[in-house]
Curated annotation (Swiss-Prot):
Subcellular location: Spore core
Inducing or repressing factors: Expressed only in the forespore compartment of sporulating cells.
Similarity comment text for this entry: Belongs to the SspI family.
Protein name according to UniProt: Small, acid-soluble spore protein I
HAMAP family: SspI
Keyword Cell cycle: no
Length: 70
Protein backbone atom coordinates (compact mmCIF):
# COMPACT_ATOMS: atom_id res chain seq x y z
CA UNK A 1 0.00 0.00 0.00
CA UNK A 2 1.41 3.37 -1.03
CA UNK A 3 0.39 6.07 1.44
CA UNK A 4 1.41 9.57 0.49
CA UNK A 5 1.40 11.32 3.85
CA UNK A 6 1.97 14.77 2.39
CA UNK A 7 -1.01 14.46 0.04
CA UNK A 8 -3.22 13.21 2.87
CA UNK A 9 -2.23 16.12 5.11
CA UNK A 10 -2.62 18.65 2.29
CA UNK A 11 -6.07 17.23 1.61
CA UNK A 12 -7.05 17.49 5.29
CA UNK A 13 -6.04 21.15 5.57
CA UNK A 14 -6.74 22.43 2.07
CA UNK A 15 -9.90 24.31 3.05
CA UNK A 16 -8.74 25.47 6.48
CA UNK A 17 -8.60 29.16 7.33
CA UNK A 18 -5.96 30.80 9.56
CA UNK A 19 -7.83 30.00 12.78
CA UNK A 20 -8.26 26.35 11.86
CA UNK A 21 -4.61 26.01 10.88
CA UNK A 22 -3.52 27.58 14.16
CA UNK A 23 -5.87 25.31 16.11
CA UNK A 24 -4.41 22.29 14.32
CA UNK A 25 -0.86 23.29 15.26
CA UNK A 26 -1.70 24.20 18.86
CA UNK A 27 -3.70 21.00 19.38
CA UNK A 28 -0.91 18.84 17.97
CA UNK A 29 1.69 20.47 20.22
CA UNK A 30 -0.45 20.49 23.38
CA UNK A 31 -1.57 16.92 22.81
CA UNK A 32 2.05 15.81 22.63
CA UNK A 33 1.33 12.58 20.78
CA UNK A 34 4.22 11.40 18.66
CA UNK A 35 1.84 10.37 15.88
CA UNK A 36 1.26 14.10 15.26
CA UNK A 37 4.94 14.81 14.52
CA UNK A 38 4.85 13.88 10.82
CA UNK A 39 1.92 16.24 10.28
CA UNK A 40 3.72 19.07 12.02
CA UNK A 41 6.74 18.31 9.86
CA UNK A 42 4.66 18.63 6.70
CA UNK A 43 3.20 21.92 7.95
CA UNK A 44 6.68 23.21 8.75
CA UNK A 45 7.85 22.17 5.29
CA UNK A 46 5.04 24.27 3.77
CA UNK A 47 5.94 27.24 5.96
CA UNK A 48 9.61 26.91 5.02
CA UNK A 49 8.92 26.68 1.30
CA UNK A 50 6.79 29.84 1.41
CA UNK A 51 9.15 31.92 3.55
CA UNK A 52 11.74 34.40 2.36
CA UNK A 53 15.35 34.32 3.52
CA UNK A 54 14.75 36.72 6.42
CA UNK A 55 11.83 34.67 7.72
CA UNK A 56 13.90 31.49 7.44
CA UNK A 57 16.73 33.13 9.39
CA UNK A 58 14.28 34.16 12.13
CA UNK A 59 12.89 30.62 12.33
CA UNK A 60 16.38 29.16 12.64
CA UNK A 61 17.27 31.66 15.37
CA UNK A 62 14.06 30.82 17.23
CA UNK A 63 14.78 27.11 16.87
CA UNK A 64 18.33 27.56 18.14
CA UNK A 65 17.02 29.49 21.14
CA UNK A 66 14.46 26.78 21.88
CA UNK A 67 17.02 23.99 21.57
CA UNK A 68 19.29 25.75 24.06
CA UNK A 69 16.44 25.80 26.58
CA UNK A 70 15.94 22.02 26.49
Amino acid sequence: MDLNLRKAIYSNISNNDEQQLEATIVDAIQNGEEKMLPGLGVLFELIWKHSDDQEKKEMIQSLESGVKQL
